[in-house]
Amino acid sequence: MKKICLLGLCLLTLGSAAAQKSLVKEVERDLKSNPASYPDQMKKLAPAFTNAETATEAQTWYIAGKGAFDYYDQQSVFAQMGKDVKKNLLGMSMLEGYDYFSKALPLDSVTDNKGKVKTKYSKDIIKQIANHYNDFNNAALFLWEAQAYPEAVKAWELYTSLPSNPTFAKAIKAPADTLMAEIMYNMGIGNSLAQNNEAALKNFKDAIAHGYDKKNAFDYAIAAASQLNNLQEMADISEKAYEIYGKEDTRYIGYMVNNFIDKKEYAKADKLIDKYITEDPNNAQLYFVKGVLCDSEGKSEEAVANLKKAIELDDQNANALFQYGYKIYQKACEIDQNEGGDMSNADYAKFRAEKVDPLLKEAAGYLEKSLVIDETLSDSRQVLRSIYYNLNDEENLKRVENM
């Protein structure tokens, strides 16, 4: 009885394998006659991808890969003609085709009558991928239009990596660095949109290394590094950016100095900012950064002097106005705390009117101006609320609270 059961099981297995092989041939015929049926044919072919017999045969994956590329060829022509196509499926067919071909290559070995092992599909697979090399870029664009950003990035990854892949290197000529750099930049945008900041940072850095020196590349790289809380990367990228765009955007200096402050390497920070001030002595932002640095080092008087210099050079620098106003506010609070004790109410009122309130009002003026220039400075609003509360100025307190 056991022998009969085992025989039945063997016959069932063989029958299943034969059915899958027949299915593979059927799908091959259907794809040849109707490339547009590719999506449906892959659903039909799905069992062959997991069947122990057909899943280990190169033919199964080769047919799927060729079907994907033929579908792309047909549908991309339709797209050029202005016909309605599913851009997501169109772009994905290139990725799927490459994946299918990649599975076929290591399985492609045929033993001839003389016992020699040869390949049956590999030559055509390499040719197919090489001939469709530029289509990986086109596929990425189709996927981008369909807002399939991770998939678009994957297509661009193939476009940028295939020329250096030993399997395809002889058949594919790498594009110029300028095009490579632009595509790496686009990959960074795609990964940023997909919130993959680590990959985006690498993409932007690769683009810069390949000669993409537009300001956005540096700024987006810094933004990605910021999302990763990587101050060192922010500083390294800023150093390169400052060489090109430092005159128009001195925030780069701030990122470099912040990195030193975070590491408490104040001497290096001082040396860096002093060097740039020597080179550009009329740059208000440099004095602002110097002021913040001095404040971090506990050099309050130097901080105030540098912040004041920043405002004198640029009275529209909202951050400098805020920091300067805040330092005056701190001074008022310090005087009040250190000198305002052990007094009668009358003496304290006189003391406040002469020494504290004038400083609070002066600070308020700078803070108010900072908000006129940049209404997003929430810290300015917070300090102003405290000032007007201490001045018993209900009208201005209510106004600031309603901002």
What is each model feature region?
Residues 60, 168-172, 183, 216-218, ...:
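TPR alpha-solenoid repeat register
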